[in-house]
Amino acid sequence: MTDRKLAEVLANATPFALPLAKPFRGVTHREGVILAGPSGFGEFAPFLEYDDQTCARWLASAIEAAYGRWPDSRRGEVPVNAIIPALAPHDAAAMAYRGFVGDGCRTVKIKVAEVGQTLDDDVARVEAVRSAQQSAAVPNPRIRVDANGGWSLADATVAIRELDRAAGGLEYVEQPCRTLAELAELRRVVSVPIAADESIRTAGDPIRAVQQQAADIVVVKVPPLGGVNLAREVVGAAGVPVVVSGAMDSAVG
């Protein structure tokens, strides 16, 4: 992109700061910039700790959305999951019930392994959400949990078995440990499918995760990969089921 074109992009940029309904791991607001271009709107909102190379991919994704071209849509709607933060059981159940009844979600992803909480807290939260699913008479209900890399290998082995029981069967557990080596070892000792999320941040990461037998599923976020077109290439090369996820985006992102 030329300096002149970049100046045009920045001239049509609008900063934003949106409060989160529920704080997430110390984050209370999402801050970023909305780009307005001939193709629509793009969102540039990398996290503050990211380096320049990572931020450049997020910017490329935003520019693609505002100035580039996406592939034609293949469907008019896609299923989504409700997300339950690391809340107390009663609050988690109430939030889940609203997602099931009000929003029509059949699948819920529950945050676990929160700093300062225990496995007992996680088990109680999952049991409460499962009860809410049953009360809402959700057809073909599914429960996923997301540890955001918060467990050691030993803790993950115990926690996954307990949470699988509490859920009546987990669909999968997302990023239970931090490294691909830990995920690969964990896959050998638990029966619940493992999804890699934080381990997938560049185009080559899904391939490495599969080659190292570290994931049954890969979670793809578009901004870290540089845009929709690059993300499609990653999905095609992964060779395992893919879940497309957000990155704490606004309604634009």
Which positions does each model-derived feature cover?
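Catalytic core of soluble alpha/beta enzymes
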Residues: V112-G253
